[in-house]
């Protein structure tokens, strides 16, 4: 069986852990049942959850059995954040989000075979527990002093907002999840982000006190860029995995923009490429950075992992059509709309408005005289076809799927025309 810890360390996917040699021995001894939890606090998972899904997949490929926990109960409580109380959502909203997360998670794991994954929901055991049961059977094993010393709890208590008893109690519920999964599924390992370390160790302590058994946890580091800032924000916000919240095209473009200083490290973290493949791409970054081979490989791999091969091909076709000279008419309406969603746009009338009007309306030129000059010199195109007539009028044949047309000035100034 693969020494999975060495692989995770090489990829930069291992931060804190319980006793390393004991954990290594435990994993090498045979299939281990492990779990990672995902709370439905939003309609979609994001790139941070993707790191955890990738770790789960690595462990499964090494022969271990994943339990993917959707927090139908803990999602109604909310893990304490660095600042500010979470807004509690209704039971119906949390259930809807939990269903969506269930669907997203299921794409990353195999649910058949000797290391088959299992989906679980902590609402199944938490909703059956009364307040008295929780306090008598679980709460008595927790010491308030230890709970107060957890990093985020301590920061929140010291802040003006403080922390509610609801969020303060979250760590008890998470620890109980580990205990329940140990009892129900023989689960002996929890994985998660480094910000969850304190809660995860709480589960290890609880199982030791209640069952007299040693279990394990390991965390991934918080992903940062080479300059030390946190990784994972686009102009539109978080890097969502749901295509309804971030289109596959925008998702691909985000990864394509990763800096040279970060791309090799991110290839290790976010893809399943071999050491040899990544080392070859590292040479490309060092010797031919302008070709951006590593960024293209990263963007393609992560997009295919999250959205599938068909969506990747659509994204590549759209990218080629917009920036590589491909045929824009090959794009269907949905792909074209997604690829042009963030471009500037103007509404114009077929048969009345000219290409010069469009250049002015978009702010590409200050006036019609300059616009006509640009057109005459071959500096403007409609749908990747150069326009040279300075009096050219927008025509029916210029209309693409969805009533759109693309206009370009030079190489970099690209915009959308909404034609009617």
Describe the role of every protein-language-model region.
Residues 207-420:
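Conserved nucleotide- and phosphate/pyrophosphate-binding catalytic cores
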Residues 1-196, 201-204, 211-216, 229:
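NTP-dependent nucleotidyl-transfer catalytic core
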């Amino acid at each position: 069986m693969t020494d999975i810890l060495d692989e995770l360390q090489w990829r930069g996917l291992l931060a804190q852990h319980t006793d390393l040699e004991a954990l290594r021995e435990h994993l090498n001894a045979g299939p281990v049942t492990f779990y990672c939890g995902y709370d439905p606090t939003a309609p979609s998972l994001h790139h941070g959850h993707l790191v955890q899904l990738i770790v789960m997949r690595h462990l499964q490929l090494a022969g271990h059995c994943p339990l993917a926990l959707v927090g139908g109960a803990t999602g109604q409580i909310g893990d304490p954040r660095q600042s500010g109380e979470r807004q509690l959502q209704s039971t119906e909203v949390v259930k809807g989000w939990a269903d969506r997360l269930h669907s997203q998670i299921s794409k990353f794991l195999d649910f058949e075979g000797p290391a088959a994954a299992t989906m679980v929901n902590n609402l199944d055991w938490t909703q059956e527990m009364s307040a008295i049961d929780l306090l008598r059977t679980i709460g008595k094993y927790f010491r308030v002093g230890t709970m107060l010393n957890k990093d985020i709890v301590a920061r929140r208590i010291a802040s003006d907002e403080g922390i509610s008893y609801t969020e303060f109690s979250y760590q008890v519920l998470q620890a109980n999840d580990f205990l329940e999964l140990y009892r129900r599924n023989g689960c002996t390992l929890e994985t998660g982000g480094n910000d969850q370390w304190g809660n995860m160790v709480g589960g290890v302590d609880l199982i030791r006190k209640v069952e007299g058994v040693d279990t394990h946890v390991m965390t991934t580091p918080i992903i940062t860029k080479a300059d030390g800032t946190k990784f994972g924000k686009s102009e539109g916000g978080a890097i969502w995995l749901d295509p309804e919240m971030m289109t596959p095209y925008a998702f691909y473009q985000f990864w394509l923009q990763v800096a040279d200083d970060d791309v090799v490290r991110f290839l290790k973290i976010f893809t399943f490429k071999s050491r040899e493949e990544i080392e070859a791409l590292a040479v490309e970054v060092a010797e031919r950075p302008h070709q951006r081979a590593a960024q293209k490989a990263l963007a393609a791999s992560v997009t295919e992992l999250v959205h599938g091969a068909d969506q990747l091909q659509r994204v590549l076709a759209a990218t080629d059509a917009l920036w590589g000279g491909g045929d824009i008419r090959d794009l269907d309406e949905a792909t074209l709309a997604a690829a042009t969603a963030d471009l500037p746009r103007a509404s114009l009338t077929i048969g009345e408005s000219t290409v010069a009007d469009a250049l002015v309306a978009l702010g590409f030129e200050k006036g019609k005289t300059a616009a006509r000059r640009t057109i005459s010199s071959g500096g403007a195109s409609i749908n990747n076809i150069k326009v040279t007539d300075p009096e050219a009028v927008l025509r029916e044949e210029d209309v693409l799927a969805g009533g759109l047309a693309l206009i370009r000035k030079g190489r970099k100034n690209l915009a959308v025309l909404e034609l009617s």
